[in-house]
Amino acid sequence: MIRHVFLWRVAPTADPAKVLAILSELPERVPGIRNFALGKFRDDLGTPPFAWDYGLSCEFDSIGDLATYFEHPQHQDIIARLEPMISDRAVCHFDAAGAANPE
């Protein structure tokens, strides 16, 4: 199982609700996504200077499925729609089965 994590900051002129609405379309538009989660940073413990505004995580059965997701036309459409609304981003994907014992 491959876990994909996407973190981002919303551009000052963008509507955060619109960004979330667009990203929430992913599971319906792109096949192969598992355990999709999307949300705003929780500042219950304060906000460190390195915090991101929002996060998305999902899983794929294989690295091949993740590659298919990256190249899928619907995923590419969502990226194009989000580009002007996101000021900064970070992406990480890793083997979720080995998450407890990273090498």
Across the structure, where does each feature detected by a protein language model lie?
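Short, flexible helix/strand-to-coil boundary loops that buttress conserved ligand/catalytic motifs
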Residues: 70, 79-82
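N-terminal soluble domains immediately following signal/targeting peptides that reside
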Residues: 73-75
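Interfacial aromatic-anchored transmembrane helix boundaries in multi-pass membrane proteins
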Residues: 87-89
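Residues that form generic nucleotide/phosphate-binding pockets
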Residues: 22, 81, 85
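Short S/T/G/P-rich N-terminal loop/turn motif that feeds into the first structured element of a domain
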Residues: 1-53, 61-71, 94-103
